[in-house]
Amino acid sequence: MARAASKAARTTEKGLVIERRFTTAGVHPYDELEWEKRDAIIGDPAKPAFEQRGVEFPKTWSQNATNIVAQKYFRGQLGSPERETSVKQMVSRVADRITEVGREAGYFASHEDADAFDAELTSILVNQKAAFNSPVWFNVGWKEPGQEQASACFILSVEDDMDSILSWNTKEGIIFKGGSGSGINLSKIRGSMEPLSKGGIASGPVSFMRGADSWAGAIKSGGGTRRAAKMVVLDVDHPDIEKFIWCKADEEKKAAALKAADFDMRLDSDAFTSVQFQNANNSVRVTDEFMEAVANDEDWDLVARTDGRPIKTVKARDLMNQIADAAWQCADPGIQYDTTINRWHTDPNTGPITASNPCSEYMSIDDSACNLASLNLMKFRNEDGSFNVDDFTHAVDIVFLAQEILVGFSSYPTEQITRNARAFRQLGLGYANLGALLMAEGMPYDSVEGRALAGSITALMTGRGYRMSARIAATTGPYDGYAVNREAHNQVMRMHQSAAYEIEDELVEEPLLHAARESWDEAVALGEQHGYRNAQATVLAPTGTISFLMDCDTTGIEPDFSLVKFKELVGGGQMKIVNGSVNLALETLGYSTSEIEQIDAYINEHNTIIGAPALKDEHLPVFDVAVGERSISHTGHIDMMAAAQPFLSGAISKTVNLPETATVSDIADAYMDGWKKGLKALAIYRDGSKTAQALKTDAGDKKSEPAAEDPKPKRNKMPRERESITHKFSVGMHEGYITAGKYPDGSVGEIFLTDIGKEGSTIKGLMNAFATAISMGLQYGVPLEDYVKKFSYMRFEPEGITRNPEIPFAKSLPDYIMRWLASRFIDDVDYLESLGIMTDEVRARKEAQQAFPMDDTAGDGGNGHSNGEGNGTANGSAEPEAEAKPATAALTDTPPVVPAKMGADLELGPACDQCGGMMQRTG
């Protein structure tokens, strides 16, 4: 098999000979497909967010892929003649442009070979066997030559001076505009405890992160089709590492407060964009030395950037616990394992790897770039369940060559990145749909067989990629940086080769494992002879949008998120369906057609496979998914990453999902586990830890109880039509209106404050926010009495006399508002009297008390010292009647009765019934 596949691209002195496998000379790939015209509509058909009618797609492409491709990747202004209307236009625009440049650059042995390459690449793309990263679809063949940015990933650098810091922001803006993302390590910037050369103290990297985050948030990546993407890295020995660890978690508390106040906290909402540090992923760079210090509970120095002196010493384990605690709260920061990363570095003599792209899969030298592409693994599964090695290796050859050609004519945001991209020519070939493939094969994601299959496929992909790289180098020469890094690069190749022979033979089908090992044997041998055209070959990217383009069930290396999904229908609307890989798995496991139909119907009804008729208990692990009742453990995620990592040039973009009940210790253990198992990076997500959560599972998944939390409160929204009462008030020289909306039972559920201050003034904004917060609290069940207790007699300007005889004097606007609400919605006369609210009932009571003095033994008499328990004393002890003082002694200007509980809560004396001021207690 492997020998036949190796014919895909032979090398001659003139260039590469391209064999056809997916196409036939003289027959265009488009002619082998059935096509149809559809409408691409996103959102409500009556008022769609996007609409393009009459677009042409292959019949095999789903409506979901149609909508996403038309909206994201078709170029040209909607409604204009230039607007693309067919997948044929989009695919040919890219494939033809790459082939054109390949011809001109001498990659092909003949025109026929160039034609074969064009046809094979077109076939691979239009049949959803592979896809390039988004910038290729955005720019290639559409932008003018010299402006065709094809890379999705960039790594930048920054020095410890203002010019460099400001330049960093400019570079990022250019990258985001082109539809790409970037990462940077800020560890060269001195900490906030370090002095400046001309006096004063440095701002520190976290302060500069604020500005960069806002800048990123203001730029829609790719002309408004994607959010800007950033990665910020800080070394674990930086003086500001603790500030860095907590910066996002602290902002997440703000997001939670906004959500509690009923602000829209979706990822693109105005409220969410006000929360800082949300446009970047944060990662801490840790070394083996630090991780060993954590394991041994040793001290760890945070050192100055200027002279290397220790500024602060902490416990390494405490620092790791802080990282885990912050990640528990908000999923950041992640971890990057610096020593491991640089151990597998092919170009260490040029410089170390200090950072990554936003998703942590591309790791290379500073000021460098990588263009990505991904293969759809399910397209290489034969009907009998075997893996089609020949098709896969051929696709690797074609797509890898296309990526290599892209490097040469792609544009780059800076001169330094341009030089490094063309000198090192880093590529990022990867795959998607691994989770679906494993399920279809009847293999649990968390199993030794599943990990062995994933490792073998990854080994084959990277070995074949470097084999192709060496073939290209035989014609064009190796990459410019190869000579100075030759021994290091070749040593890393041997490390990959050795890892391929560590996969257990009995766990993988022989043709696949044989091809994987043979590809590495050939890659190492050819590299020793010719060198390599590319410093890096593969990564495992998240394949977000392009996985939908390829109609993948799962992204990157991820398992299935849920067994049920919603399919967009061609005529509009949605239909709930069971993932196709479920039925394939059941077939592989030997279930009959009728049994599969029963199980399928059960999943559709219950949104889970647990309890399905005819399903054997031993097969349940095959259907474990990322979240839900039978979710894959975090160790299962980490073990899968560890199976693939030895065969990748870069790293793996993957989220390790943990349930909401996971603890801080679980996260710290996961970070340690990732280090021990040889990962390059690890990101954790505890379910529910983000205020704006991007992806939800199906409604049928049972929610586990929150860790150490009470059930979440429910909001009792106001009816559409409700009664209200509006009250005009004045406090000092300030006037305004309070409107209180009522539930059908007459209780208050919302307040509005109007005409308080000028439009746009601080006081108006604050009072509007105050009213919103109070309204939300009332609707979530906070008792009005609690608000009244908290805000009554709160003192600040404006304060003064009012025109309300019930509340003659107010210490502040919240004081007046709360006491007025109490006067209208609280019937407890004692309570109102204790607040100095002189309602008619309170005045009548006072007059009655003065006219008919009560006996001291009545329990809560008018001596001003009652504790509310009926004993007539302040301390709760009963005084003998013989010693009781006559009640008439206390009747002159008797202050309002203050129940002991209320007095203790307010810690104030009763109010004067003339001016409303709180009197000082004298006994």
What kind of feature is each model-predicted range?
Residues I756, G760-D840:
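Phosphate-backbone binding interfaces of nucleic-acid-interacting proteins
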